[in-house]
Amino acid sequence: MNDLATYNFAYLDEQTKRMIRRAILKAIAIPGYQVPFASREMPMPYGWGTGGVQVTASILGPDDVLKVIDQGADDTTNAVSIRAFFQKVADVAVTTRTTEATIIQTRHRIPEEQLREGQTLVYQVPIPEPLRFLEPRETETRKMHALEEYGLMHVKLYEDIARNGHIATTYAYPVKVEGRYVMDPSPTPKFDNPKMHMSEALQLFGAGREKRIYAVPPYTEVVSLDFEDHPFEVQKFDKPCALCGAENVYLDEVVLDDKGGRMFVCSDTDHCEDRRAHGHAGAMLAPAAKESQEAAE
């Protein structure tokens, strides 16, 4: 008897994968629309990426190369545990390089490296409904999506302007997909929103606890909501990355000591490591880089 006959590749059984793939196909056909699916119990608690893991398990093949990131980093707890999980249940190749991966599962970030055709970005989504905190009743939000009644969302953004003088929302910033559905891009910083627009990669969103899947196909128009007199703007950082000197990237603040010392470094660890490998150095590494260069000479 073949041992593979009783083995489920990538943990989920084939009937479950088929059901999730049907939901994915419907989501791709209707960009931004939340497709219900029968979420399964996974060997991790809800809120730790069960939706993204189920989507990844359903599309993962033996020849795929998997990359998992958590807020841009490859070495954080969530990323390491999910990567180890798929290595164990699927024995697929894994990588930390964005350019080498065919499937990238992410929590709260989009890689700085521009994604290409053939790649798939799988988002872990805690709350898929962009109107949830404005209208908690699911029956009402479904009607609002069906009738394209998104005035409430614009009122929320206007209230930001009235209170703060600008739109203060910095993450989970709502977008309109292909001129139709308003979508929650998951709690990614609004810095990443422009990367979703006309991306060459397929973007899939899985919410396990909420039992929803939605998608943005390649080359799809994704526009962040704004006003003519208050256009959408991304966050700006005053300093470059302290390790690689990169500018125009999303930075994380790192506390260095208990005296107020801090530095800002690339959220995307692969992007930062790649730049340093090519000789770039930020303020924190510049002295060490200079010393090593002088020693080599």
Swiss-Prot record:
Catalytic reactions of this protein: alpha-D-ribose 1-methylphosphonate 5-phosphate + AH2 + S-adenosyl-L-methionine = alpha-D-ribose 1,2-cyclic phosphate 5-phosphate + methane + 5'-deoxyadenosine + L-methionine + A + H(+)
Enzyme Commission identifier(s): 4.7.1.1
Protein name, entry field: Alpha-D-ribose 1-methylphosphonate 5-phosphate C-P-lyase
InterPro entries noted in UniProt: PhnJ (IPR010306)
Annotated GO MF terms: 4 iron, 4 sulfur cluster binding; alpha-D-ribose 1-methylphosphonate 5-phosphate C-P-lyase activity; metal ion binding
The keyword S-adenosyl-L-methionine is assigned to this record: yes
Keywords for this protein: 4Fe-4S, Iron, Iron-sulfur, Lyase, Metal-binding, Plasmid, S-adenosyl-L-methionine
Family to which the UniProt record says this protein belongs: Belongs to the PhnJ family.
Function: Catalyzes the breakage of the C-P bond in alpha-D-ribose 1-methylphosphonate 5-phosphate (PRPn) forming alpha-D-ribose 1,2-cyclic phosphate 5-phosphate (PRcP).
A single BP term in Gene Ontology: organic phosphonate catabolic process
Cofactor names: [4Fe-4S] cluster
Gene encoding the protein: phnJ
Entry's cofactor comment: Binds 1 [4Fe-4S] cluster per subunit.
Disulfide linkage: none
Native source species: Rhizobium meliloti (strain 1021) (Ensifer meliloti)
